[in-house]
């Protein structure tokens, strides 16, 4: 298999969240940013506070940010509490959805737009790419783009997963 690429239709996605709800891609209103991660991944630990900033930057309802955990419910809950994550965390402990999307590593983000088309794939942690994702989401929701990671932020420009 190969990682789902830009321009391809996103595989179906239906996963239970830590909140007990089932999240289905085909029921989402607006674009979905799906971020695959593992709780043991140091790059994921670096990235998730910035994903939280992105989540807080734009009104909910016009878009969705879903973290897709490749770990157990208890480990995922501990990660959420440690990092102050408030966006939905979906559980893919059996890796069925991860295998369908086939990210090369974690974190990997898939921005899924209208018609379930993958419009952006961002592997690893990339400062510039997070700000570009922010601008794209702002366009979807009709808001001014928010800078998620300012130039003077001490995070490295890139960190592989």
Where are these regions (language model features)?
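Structural microenvironment flanking redox-active thiols in thiol-disulfide oxidoreductases
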Residues: 45-83
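Non-globular targeting/processing and membrane-anchoring segments
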Residues: 1-32, 64, 81-82, 102-105, ...
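Short active-site neighborhood of thiol/selenol oxidoreductases, capturing the structured segment around
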Residues: 24-45, 51
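Short beta->alpha linker loops
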Residues: 71, 92-93, 128
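Short, glycine-anchored, charge-dense loop/turn motifs used at functional sites
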Residues: 20, 110-119, 123
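Short, internal strand/loop/helix patches
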Residues: 80-115
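Cofactor-binding loop segments of dinucleotide-utilizing enzymes, especially the Rossmann-like FAD-
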Residues: 38, 70, 114
């Amino acid at each position: 298999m190969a990682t789902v690429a830009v321009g391809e239709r996103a595989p179906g996605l239906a996963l239970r969240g830590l909140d007990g709800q089932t999240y289905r891609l085909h029921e989402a209103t607006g674009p979905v940013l799906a971020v695959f991660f593992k709780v043991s991944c140091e790059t994921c630990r670096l990235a998730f506070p910035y994903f939280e900033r992105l989540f807080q930057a734009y009104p909910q309802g016009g878009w969705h940010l879903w973290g897709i955990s490749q770990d157990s419910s208890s480990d995922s809950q501990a990660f959420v509490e440690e990092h102050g994550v408030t966006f939905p965390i979906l559980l893919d402990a059996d890796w069925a959805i991860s295998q369908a999307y086939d990210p090369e590593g974690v974190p990997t983000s898939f921005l899924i737009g209208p018609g379930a088309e993958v419009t952006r794939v961002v592997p690893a942690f990339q400062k510039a790419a997070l700000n570009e994702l922010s601008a794209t989401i702002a366009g979807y929701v009709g808001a001014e783009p928010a800078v998620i990671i300012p130039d003077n932020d001490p995070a490295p420009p890139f960190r592989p997963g």
